[in-house]
Amino acid sequence: MIKKNNLLTKKKPIANKSNKYAIRKFTVGTASIVIGAALLFGLGHNEAKAEENTVQDVKDSNMDDELSDSNDQSSNEEKNDVINNSQSINTDDDNQIKKEETNSNDAIENRSKDITQSTTNVDENEATFLQKTPQDNTQLKEEVVKEPSSVESSNSSMDTAQQPSHTTINSEASIQTSDNEENSRVSDFANSKIIESNTESNKEENTIEQPNKVREDSITSQPSSYKNIDEKISNQDELLNLPINEYENKVRPLSTTSAQPSSKRVTVNQLAAEQGSNVNHLIKVTDQSITEGYDDSDGIIKAHDAENLIYDVTFEVDDKVKSGDTMTVNIDKNTVPSDLTDSFAIPKIKDNSGEIIATGTYDNTNKQITYTFTDYVDKYENIKAHLKLTSYIDKSKVPNNNTKLDVEYKTALSSVNKTITVEYQKPNENRTANLQSMFTNIDTKNHTVEQTIYINPLRYSAKETNVNISGNGDEGSTIIDDSTIIKVYKVGDNQNLPDSNRIYDYSEYEDVTNDDYAQLGNNNDVNINFGNIDSPYIIKVISKYDPNKDDYTTIQQTVTMQTTINEYTGEFRTASYDNTIAFSTSSGQGQGDLPPEKTYKIGDYVWEDVDKDGIQNTNDNEKPLSNVLVTLTYPDGTSKSVRTDEEGKYQFDGLKNGLTYKITFETPEGYTPTLKHSGTNPALDSEGNSVWVTINGQDDMTIDSGFYQTPKYSLGNYVWYDTNKDGIQGDDEKGISGVKVTLKDENGNIISTTTTDENGKYQFDNLNSGNYIVHFDKPSGMTQTTTDSGDDDEQDADGEEVHVTITDHDDFSIDNGYYDDDSDSDSDSDSDSDDSDSDSDSDSDSDSDSDSDSDSDSDSDSDSDSDSDSDSDSDSDSGLDNSSDKNTKDKLPDTGANEDHDSKGTLLGALFAGLGALLLGKRRKNRKNKN
């Protein structure tokens, strides 16, 4: 017998291959609301981060692909030839299988009538072709010895020494969940777990009479403890009604994720409304990823090793979602929730306290889950959810090895993709002995399992081929008797076997089922003697199991192929497969439900603190505040929110001892948080906007918060006509009406606009403390007066745009003044000289009216406010031109006055007028600079 390494090493040919399924019973894990629900169709594996994920948003909320259910197959119409213990069954010539030891090929021919695809349902009218006979020593003569801790196989021949022994032990880590630790994993929605394992072994023998041999099996220890069992399971039949998914006996711990119970076990505490709308547009996906079931993240999904795909998605539920509304989640079209059965149920989404947020149903055609929200969404706000979805390769869609897929998962309108390659294992071979097998279905209603076996898939010339199917395993058993259904199909020369080891249409192959070469053994087994073959064959075995057996914990069935290598010496080789479905429950199973874990509450009161002292009930006018949003944040970062009732009360239930939670109070509009931690009584003080609370074995109903109404303030005040242009309001100066005044925030955004009244007054009310900008629009035809004149801020002008800060008080000091643009008289003085050009507008109090021509080298540009009417025009290019200019003037009439005296008077008046204009011009220039 050849000893080979376990599947994990893959350094040498595999001695034993096994498919194992296991059911684990433990509680539905809770998710926070932020919910986390682990959506686990099948067995969960260790989590690994996605290697290459591409997230994209799509608008279509429905899957376009229509996929058929690969498991809806029936074999109720199949007919089997029968051989009973007490009688033989006549068959036609077409269904005879004649065995000739000297012929290299069997004449195995049979035409199957009305073949349909099989399931594990057993027709009560269907009989088997098995006949119980004494064990023939010339057939398979290996005796299996059970060893709990190791497995061995040996290879011996007349000229070959025995190979060294190898031992393979696979163990599963215990699954325990501490309720006191902060668990970022949102949920362990786990009610059961099913593991499938394949074990293959090769044996070489050189003698007909053999000593006992030990078949190499993979030994797997099962988890011994799970917490929080939520229902009593009285027998294995109930366990089998839980979902079933492939697994195998690789050496690695089991994840705490699992499959879900069957739909008949699903109950809803709060049923959603019957009517609702699809609200995918109100679901915001914040994170999603696809990871491989094993930790290698190599992009290869080992489908025969039950490696799965894990879809994680975190999303937020809009507060507009109501009870009865629905959202959708799509798994990839090339995957299935379970590879063994349709008896799975979608887990309910719950928060950490156990309240149900949504319930789900699955549409296999569209590969779509529809979640219906309960009235939970009507009670709570800011709901966040997390789903963990586990699925397996749909072998009906992916029959070939090394198939590359671009898988896509989608929640609501957001999808994520990942590229993977599907890998199937190769047959177990030992010289000409070569085979592979898998459990392909389990029927928990009729208590049957279906095993699909490939015999000689490599098309070797196999001499004296004998196949033994045994229900006696090291870890479990099936029932091989006259109720066992066995069908045999021959694969034609031009036909290929699917690499997936799954047959969905047996009618494509030649049915060669015959009773002559199949005989029941004495040890819960059956032998099928094929003789000499060189074609592949398919064996479909449907056998029963006993779910009520006291020590029944697993289903295991073994198939062994033996071929003769040397007809003269009797040397032969064997290759074996073990297929296992293991059932185990947590400790305490059968003793009733574990008592529920004690949980605690946090509350309690939000009030209006009229006297702003931070202590409740110190003022008769203090009252509760309703509709205040209060948020509880769990240790894992998830959260949920409620609003205070009409009495100002709030409460969060279902909180665990020893954990620390954060309570946050939203400040109501128009209110300000009061003082924190005032006084000596923590039950009457205020915690402020947020506080961390640790549960220490009791409820904490002292988490209160007080608020007082935020005072409102006003801003103004006056725009006046500054007749004296001094920038200070005078008693006789009047207000200007109709001036536009704009109030802005500190960023320049307009808050409000008003106009001054008939008295020049304006006012903005209901303002909070803060920074503001006041802008005055200058009236048409008026000029801004001097700003910030004098020492009284309430009497001066503040200018066109004023920055104002309000701090707990009104501000009625924001004023502005204007005067008319045309209040100045005209006085023009133009002077041209060699050195200067001067324009002078002067108003003086002089009553003179004179014209004079003068020479001037002054540089001046002046305006005066004198009231005289005096025009002085002087054009001078040089001193030589003065006499010439004077001569061109018309003479004045003779008034009888002294000519010299008049000339001197005129000259003196002109000098005074020029001096006055110069002084007044300088004054105006200074005022302009000041303005």
Swiss-Prot record:
Residues 147-157 have a biased composition (Low complexity). One of its GO terms (biological process) is cell adhesion. It is found in: Secreted, Cell wall. Residues 577-588 are annotated as: Interaction with human fibrinogen. Keywords: Calcium, Cell wall, Metal-binding, Peptidoglycan-anchor, Repeat, Secreted, Signal, Virulence. Changing residue 339 to A: Loss of interaction with human fibrinogen. Changing residue 338 to H: Loss of interaction with human fibrinogen. Residues 52-62, 95-114, 201-218, 800-812, 883-904 have a biased composition (Basic and acidic residues). GO terms for cellular component: extracellular region. The keyword Secreted applies. Residues 1-50 form the signal peptide. It holds the Pfam family SdrD_B. Its main location: secreted. A motif (LPXTG sorting signal) lies at residues 892-896. Ca(2+) binds at residues 292, 297, 300, 307. Belongs to the serine-aspartate repeat-containing protein (SDr) family. PANTHER family: COLOSSIN-B-RELATED. This is Serine-aspartate repeat-containing protein G. It comes from Staphylococcus epidermidis. The lineage of its organism: Bacteria, Bacillati, Bacillota, Bacilli, Bacillales. The gene is sdrG.
